[in-house]
Curated annotation (Swiss-Prot):
UniProt keyword terms in alphabetical order: Bacterial flagellum biogenesis, Chaperone, Cytoplasm, Translation regulation
Subcellular location, principal: cytoplasm
Organism expressing this protein natively: Geobacillus kaustophilus (strain HTA426)
Disulfide bonds: none
GO CC term (a single one): cytoplasm
InterPro entries: Flagellar_assembly_factor_FliW (IPR003775), Flagellar_assmbl_FliW_dom_sf (IPR024046)
Function: Acts as an anti-CsrA protein, binds CsrA and prevents it from repressing translation of its target genes, one of which is flagellin. Binds to flagellin and participates in the assembly of the flagellum.
Top-rank taxon: Bacteria
Protein name as catalogued: Flagellar assembly factor FliW
GO biological process: bacterial-type flagellum assembly; regulation of translation
Family: Belongs to the FliW family.
Compartment list: Cytoplasm
Database matches in NCBIfam families: PRK13285.1-1
Entry-linked HAMAP family: FliW
C-alpha cells in the first residue's frame, strides 16, 4: 500500500510492517497504525502514522545516548503487547528536535515499546521514576 509521509514523501509499505497501537498514543488516541522508517545515514527512526501524513515522531533507540537507561514493564503492558521475553521488545524514545540541534531532548519517561514479532506498540508512561520528559541528547557546552 502507498502512504504519504512527513519526512520520506510518498512511499510503498507492506501490511506486515504496520505496528498497531491499540490504544493510540497519548494526544493522538485515534492514531492506531504506524510504520517505523529509518532516516538514512542517521541513528534516527520516524514513527510515521499510516493515516495522517503530517504525523511522524522522531525516535532513537535510547541505549546509544543513555547507556544506563532501564525500564520495567508492568504485567498489563506485557499482556497488552503479548510480550513473552526480552527478545520480543524493541524500545524507543521520542525526541523533541530543537534548533540548534544540540538542544534536542529525549522523553525517557514515556518510551515507545514495540513487540517486534507481533507488531504491537504502546507508549508507556513510567511512574515512580527519576526519568523526565526532557533529557538532553548532548551534554551542554561550557562557555569559554
Amino acid at each position: 500500500m502507498k502512504i504519504a509521509t512527513k519526512y520520506h514523501g510518498d512511499i510503498e509499505i507492506h501490511e506486515k510492517d504496520i505496528v498497531r497501537f491499540e490504544q493510540g498514543i497519548p494526544g493522538f488516541l485515534e492514531e492506531k497504525q504506524f510504520v517505523l522508517l529509518p532516516l538514512e545515514d542517521t541513528p534516527f527512526i520516524i514513527l510515521q502514522s499510516v493515516n495522517t501524513p503530517a504525523l511522524g515522531f522522531v525516535l532513537i533507540e535510547p541505549f546509544s545516548y543513555f547507556p544506563t537507561y532501564e525500564i520495567e514493564l508492568d504485567d498489563n503492558t506485557l499482556e497488552q503487547l503479548q510480550i513473552t521475553g526480552e527478545q520480543d521488545v524493541a524500545l524507543y524514545v521520542i525526541l523533541t528536535v530543537a534548533d540548534p540541534f544540540d538542544d534536542t531532548t529525549a522523553n525517557l519517561q514515556a518510551p515507545i515499546v514495540i513487540n517486534a514479532r507481533k507488531r504491537l506498540g504502546k507508549q508507556v508512561i513510567l511512574t515512580n521514576t527519576n526519568y523526565k520528559t526532557k533529557h538532553r541528547l548532548f551534554p551542554e557546552k561550557v562557555a569559554k
